Each structure stands twice: as C-alpha cells, then as structure tokens.
Amino acid sequence: LIHNNGKNILRRGITSKDDFKPGETCLRSIKDMKLISLANTKFYPGKDEFYSFCRNTPSILIIPINIKSFILIGGWSYRCFTKSDEKWINNWAKKLNNIFLKNSF
C-alpha cells in the first residue's frame, strides 16, 4: 500500500477493501523518517492499527517516503523481511519520493 497526503494511492496484493487510515505507528515512521519493522505483530500492542490493511498479517514494514507519504508492506510469515529487503524497499521509497517531487504529488 502506498499512502500519500491522507489518501491510499496504490494497493497491491491481498489487502482489505476497507480504507486504511494511518495510526500512531505509521505517523511515527514518517515523523522520524525511519523504517519501522514489526517482525511479529502477534506481540505488538498496536496491531489493531493495521486491521484495515490486512487483518492478522504476521509482519509489517512501514517505510517513509517523505513527511506525508509511506509504503506499507505486509509479510505472510513472522520475521520474513531481511536487511536486504529493507534496503531494497528503502531505495524504492527514495525513487518514489523523486517521482512525487517531479510531479508535485
């Protein structure tokens, strides 16, 4: 899911049809401009924030694009994202930010 300026602008894969509204965790990611990895959402007290994304997703990455946009990726097993995955998606976030800047998104 790509969320930009209060709107979900792209959904791919198996996600809920509900409108995703970012909560505290997503907002902290873009405020701090840091990737947040929830390796096992079963133990995360704020997991309800992601129910409208995809209920019971075992792991989640929140990747900031800029101060008003982020990428949300769900994994289908616990601890499924590697450091290489995180670096790869961070680079995609940088590319998306460049596209947003060029096109006044």
Regions found by a protein language model. Give the residues of each.
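Short beta-strand-to-loop transition segments that serve as allosteric relay/switch motifs
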Residues: 70-80
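Extended amphipathic alpha-helical coiled-coil/heptad-repeat regions
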Residues: 65-69, 83
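Short hydrophobic beta-strand micro-motif common in sensory/regulatory domains
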Residues: 56-66
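Amphipathic alpha-helical "output/dimerization" segments
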Residues: 81-101
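Regulatory sensory and allosteric helical modules in signal-transduction proteins
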Residues: 3-53, 58, 72
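Acidic/histidine-enriched, beta-strand-rich ligand/metal-binding domains
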Residues: 52-57, 94, 99-105
